[in-house]
Amino acid sequence: MQTIEIGNKAELQACKFLHTQALEILAHNFKALPYGEIDIIALDKDTLIFIEVKYRSKTKFAQAEEMLTYSKQQKLVNSASIYLQHNPQYQDYQCRFDLIAINESNINWIKNAFGVI
């Protein structure tokens, strides 16, 4: 399976998991050029959540949680800013950056994975 297919499968798995947690999925793979994309954007009551999904099939050398770099965090913050510019109805919502780490078949949802840089 190619990297993109694996990533899409992990993101779909994350979306299904978030639905079981009563979150509303607003966007999937939101493109925010030139910064990249946000894997999942969800709404939990009055909190807008920008979610990065990381998957590791083998955890011998690193866990998925360790793959969220400082550079990626900066890109997510910038991408979130673009999302808010395009969706002003969410301007007054609280925002949060979460990580869903999938290691083999285990899902770890890390709320507030990092603060705004």
UniProtKB/Swiss-Prot annotation:
- Check the record and name the InterPro entries matching this protein: Restrct_endonuc-II-like, tRNA_endonuc-like_dom_sf, UPF0102_YraN-like
For this protein, what is any one GO molecular function term? nucleic acid binding
Which N-terminal residues, if any, form the signal peptide? none
SUPFAM superfamilies given in the database record: Restriction endonuclease-like (SSF52980)
Q: Which family does it belong to?
A: Belongs to the UPF0102 family.
Protein's recorded name: UPF0102 protein FTT_0898c
